[in-house]
Amino acid sequence: DHMISLCVHEQPAYCVAACPFKMDTKEMLYYAAKGNFKKALAIYEKITPFPMILCDGCTAPCEDNCKLCELGDGVSIREVERAIVRYGEPGRRSSVFRMRKKKRAAIFGSGLFPLFLAGELEKKMYPTTIYCKEEDYESYIAAAAGHLLESDRSNEAKRLKSMDLSFEFGCSLNLSFIREKMELADVVCASEEVAKMLAPEEAADVEIMLR
């Protein structure tokens, strides 16, 4: 019984366990090694709607916990990730069996939190409208991840544009405008900047608000 308790056969690999998103790193690397970057990217897309942004900010804790890396036989997983998101072909999601929810969501403002929230709401099929002061998709991406290379920012803007989301660009996000649009939605979310304007005495929850 003691030996059985020590068995790790059914436990996740160290790299997978170290990943905050619990991505199947081994499977992703397997397909990358085979040259199937499309399949590798599909695995990465399971954990994020914007792989280039996540990859750019990833600190790769998987590498620190990889046993092969400890022996000097590991690979730079982060660099493999970069190659996958740049050269992999994005998958096309089927609309079959994807039923739109009845409740409508509204997001006010821009930044990392509103961007990823929009991606997650779209994935869950909530009709979502984003109201922002930016003039186009690329500037909206830049507001969330201005550190991205121009080519990567452009690719993420294309990804955002292809999503089933409604955008109202160039909005004047004043209180009267926001309150008017809030009446049209069942769920309302806001960037930290807009939230401070709506409730100046409330502090942002740093546990959920990505900065």
Task: Report the location of each language-model feature.
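Short, well-ordered alpha-helix to beta-strand connector turns
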Residues: 125, 164, 184-185, 206
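Short, well-ordered loop/turn elements at secondary-structure boundaries
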Residues: 111, 183-184
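A conserved short coil-to-beta-strand element within the FAD-binding core of flavoproteins
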Residues: 168-182, 192
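N-terminal processing/targeting junctions
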Residues: 120-123, 181, 195
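Ferredoxin-type iron-sulfur electron-transfer modules and their immediate structural context
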Residues: 1-104, 151, 155-158, 185, ...
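Beta1-alpha1 glycine-rich phosphate/pyrophosphate-binding loop at the start
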Residues: 22-34, 42, 74-75, 107-172, ...
